[in-house]
Amino acid sequence: MPFFADAMNEGAYVLVEFEGKLTREELEAGRWTAQKLLEASGCGKLLIDFTAMLRRISTADIYIFAESLKVFPPGMKIGLIIPLEQKWSAEFAETLAANRGICLKVYIDHETAKIWLLSGS
């Protein structure tokens, strides 16, 4: 499977880690799995890690990804970790998410993203 998904930190958040060369269908499967885990755990925090992906994320992929996040309930907090070479897409992804009422912050470091996700802000 090209992704790992599980509730972490005793259900404090759901982590989805993607790896390899992913298709849009595999990305969608990861999002669907995350959605089911969030429903089961009752938490409102999601951490998505794209750092192990082997392909460059396109502008179209970012747009489609942001659109797919609309299925999550309002008020959900989402941290997105991307490879350093994809940092150019961070502001674009955050703006797309904000325009859809989604609280999303983009990071290049797992620990920093996790600290933000678990903080009260």
Regions found by a protein language model. Name each.
Residues 1-121:
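Amphipathic, Lys/Arg-enriched alpha-helical "gate/interface" segment within cytosolic domains
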